A protein has these predicted regions:
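Non-globular, low-confidence helical/coil segments that flank catalytic cores
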Residues: 2, 7, 22-348
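Bacterial N-terminal signal peptides
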Residues: 10-24
Length: 348
């Protein structure tokens, strides 16, 4: 090869390697955690896709409605470019959380179901939904895991720690937790809740400097048991409001102590978003914004966030979702699928 051609060839190779190097580093650092808050009309279906492409769905929405909620989950999975659900975590056995399991299992492959163990509630509808859920667990090759406080769910790319399950709670503080909780004094105990809500399987998800808390429908007294006298969690980046923002949950002992930067309320138009619970979240120390899946009819303008932060502003909605994208440095963005409004939150 002539000298001139060899020089051109060498320079070309250097240029190729330089371009590859320029794209390689951003590609590695640009991996993100994606969380889709799917509208299931006052139930829960939260799809998590880790930076390694692995998935966890928390709850499956309602049964019936011609498979409405299962279809919305499938569409979110398509948007996230995943073809199966590695894990499906059932927080508890109420219809708005476990009801959609059979319809979802007919539409998507599920690797492992996670729950808190057997149902202990006597209500007929709860027993029916639990029976239908168990039938799905018996399908081969679906796997099943019963989680207990202190367990870690083996979801690749993030750390998922179990805080509450089957009425029990974490006994030792996590990293960043353990401080005395002064907000316990403003959260008097209430009448005990014997329902499945109090048995909710709650988790803390950590992606390096980003932390996301989801306690399902955990109710007031169980929040106090978890959070008092010391806060075992520390602070979080994002808090999914407990129990859809109903006033049976969301004590200051929890909400104020975890000091969320952003709260996301998975309420329906006429389910959740109780004015008193909404106010506790809105006034929590350090809160920058609250986002809602629905405009809460009960709250009126005084107890709803601005429309830009609400995915569905009409009672008869189209199932618009909220999407969160988090980076390892703790920064994240939140996106409203209805109006494409996006807000970025810098690392702290």
């Amino acid at each position: 090869m002539p000298t001139v051609l060899r020089s051109i060839f060498a320079l070309s190779l250097l240029a190729v390697f330089a371009i590859a190097a320029a794209f390689a580093l951003p590609f590695v650092s640009a991996k993100t955690l994606e969380i889709y808050f799917i509208d299931v009309e006052g139930g829960q279906a939260t799809l998590i896709v880790t930076p390694t492409g692995h998935s966890l769905l928390i709850d499956t929405g309602w049964r019936g409605f011609e498979g409405r909620d299962a279809e919305r989950i499938v569409q979110a999975a398509k948007a996230a470019k995943i073809k199966q659900l590695d894990y499906v975590l059932i927080t508890h056995y109420h219809r708005d959380h476990v009801g959609g399991v059979p319809q979802l299992a007919d539409r998507m492959k599920v690797g492992t179901f996670i729950d808190h163990g057997p149902n202990m509630e006597d209500a007929r509808v709860v027993k029916e939904d639990y029976t239908d859920y168990v039938k799905i667990l018996q399908r081969v090759p679906i796997l099943h895991m019963v989680a207990k406080p202190g367990d870690t769910i083996p979801l690749k790319g993030v750390t998922v720690q179990v805080l509450t399950a089957a009425g029990e709670h974490l006994q030792s503080p996590l990293a960043g937790g353990g401080q005395p909780n002064t907000f316990c004094a403003t959260s008097p105990k209430r009448e005990d809740d014997p329902s499945e809500n109090a048995r909710s399987l709650g988790i803390l998800l950590t992606y390096e400097h980003f932390r996301f808390l989801d306690l399902g429908d955990l109710t007031w007294n169980k929040e106090l048991e978890l959070m008092c006298p010391a806060n075992p969690i520390g602070t979080v980046s994002v808090y999914l409001t407990s129990h859809h923002g109903l006033d049976q949950s969301g004590s200051p002992a929890l909400v104020d102590a975890i000091h969320p930067r952003v709260a996301i309320m998975n309420n329906g138009a006429r389910k959740g978003g109780s004015p008193s619970a909404w106010q506790i979240v809105k006034e929590s120390p350090g809160l920058e914004d609250m986002w809602q899946l629905h405009y809460a009819m009960e709250g009126g303008k005084e107890h709803n966030v601005p429309d830009s932060f609400i995915a569905n502003v009409d009672e008869h909605c189209e199932g618009k979702y909220i999407q969160l994208t988090a980076k390892s440095d703790g920064s994240f963005t939140v996106y409203n699928a209805r109006n494409k409004f996006t807000k970025a939150y810098k690392p702290q």
